[in-house]
Amino acid sequence: MIDYMKEYGKVSNEFALEGKVLEICPYGEGHINLTLLVTTDKKRYILQKMNTRVFPDSDGLMNNICGVTEHLKARGIETLSVVPTKDGKSYIKWEECYRVYDFIENTVTYQTASDINVFRNSGKAFGEFQNYLAEFDASKLTEIIKRFHDTPNRFAAFKEALEKDAFGRAKDCQKEIEFVLSHENTYGIAMEGLKDGSLPLRVTHNDTKLNNILMDDKTGEARAVIDLDTIMPGSMLFDFGDSIRFGASTAAEDEKDLSKVHFDINLFKAYAEGYCGAVKDSITAREAELLPYGSYLMTIECGMRFLTDYLSGDTYFATKYEGHNLVRCRTQIQLASEMEAQFKEMGEIIKEILA
């Protein structure tokens, strides 16, 4: 059994903590970084061993986090608070990289939306996060994962994997391949908009899951958006769309029975009410017009990535059985095609909310 005090006591003492460290123990559900709760005789902190294999640019990542959190704090918004090292750095690099945040007390996280109001509130939380950062110069941010939502680039990678067909799997997924190829003309709208300025460059979170919102344990209201490692420059369409992709589906991402997989327009409406209500003052007309498209784009992009990985021998996404990535791809294609069929209705919902 690991003695966390022995293992991490020394590194925790390199940070400007209040009080004497009494206890260090594992904390939370995160998979990327090792997260520990540090208790002193004065207060509590979160110590993280940063995963430099997933995110090698620790300087860029911490500059992004510090820039965004300082901007939010200057506006009186509750957010993650980076605790500096004793010599004033945002993180420490020994054999591994470590950082510390103040622990935000009296909060809880939810793994799943127990009801439609929780999903609406998550839309409000991520919308407020976007709105508060509308004036932040996103061009100052480091692109932590290069070309993360550059869908045409993802499509090029898909075509390359298809051409190679290194594992002879293309014959098993002709229908899915045909869907991805036939929608090529829909993939470039967001990137073209960012390039020509018709879509503003914004701060994007890029991991808008429900469990990345700290909720007040008494009122249930959102207190702070957390897990800021994937903060990058991008489009509002990316965060909104990805939330809808996984949040407005009636089934799990790897549901084999496609008769259970549907895009739920009522869940879309609930999230949009929360999100659009919060960004009313900063959203542009073009962004509002493209929110339904953003939902489709993030869904088809994700499906395309699953299909690319399947064709390439399952080297990126963790799989539990052969064909797992193909099953995931099929759910995303099903959702994307249902969204496509309901663009008009989705657009009317957005217009009504923003009217």
Question: Can you say where each PLM-predicted feature lies in the sequence?
Answer:
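ATP-binding glycine-rich phosphate-binding loop
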Residues: 20-40
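ATP-dependent phospho-/nucleotidyl transfer catalytic cores
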Residues: 25-29, 52-59, 107-122, 135-205, ...
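Active-site beta-strand-loop-beta-strand hairpin of nuclease catalytic cores
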Residues: 39-44, 220-221
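Hydrophobic alpha-helical bundle architecture
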Residues: 102, 274-295
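Catalytic activation segment of kinase domains across protein kinase-like and atypical kinase folds
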Residues: 211-250
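Active-site activation/catalytic loop segments of kinase-like enzymes and analogous catalytic loops
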Residues: 237-280, 297-316
